[in-house]
Amino acid sequence: ISVYRFSANGAVAAISCRGGYPVYMRKTGKMGDFILEYRQALDKAKRYLEKIGLAGFKETYYFTDEGVCVINFAYLDGRTVCYTDLVKVGVAMDSGEIMLLETSGYLSNHTDRAFESPAVTIEKAAEKVNKKLKIRNMELTLIPTDSGGEVRCYEFLCETEDEQEILIYINAVTGEEERILILLKSDGGTLVK
């Protein structure tokens, strides 16, 4: 994405040359004591996205580092969570100020998609999940492929016998397993491996 870069008052920003969309913004500064809870930071991030014209997103994962809670949002296309179309928003946990915005995933990948009904039902896809795992949640998703494309999958949030959470992605067209991710939870948030 070609951008115009700006900097002032401890912040840097980039606006796309085509369309004038915000591509990224980062502010620096010393963070004070945490006064916000995650839900408050999430609310501020959602309101910020709406303010800049980015609506229709679902929060996915977050982590807090050096006083900033960075929340990942995926575009919601009908009932499909599009992980390919990601936006990140960072909220200062001491003041609620927006410290980070990254939209390049969304700007690079978002397009109007005409999703057809999945060839494989969610029940058939669930049969592919190992029976030793407890399925806690299921939803339709669009995930990136290693080759730069995208594939529509059912996402199964599962739990192992030792309470480790994992995500299993089953292709909604072929019924084959596409990917397995491990959820890494800590006091600072949740990341995937």
Give the predicted meaning of each segment.
Residues 1-193:
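Long, terminal "pre-/pro-" and other extracytoplasmic accessory regions
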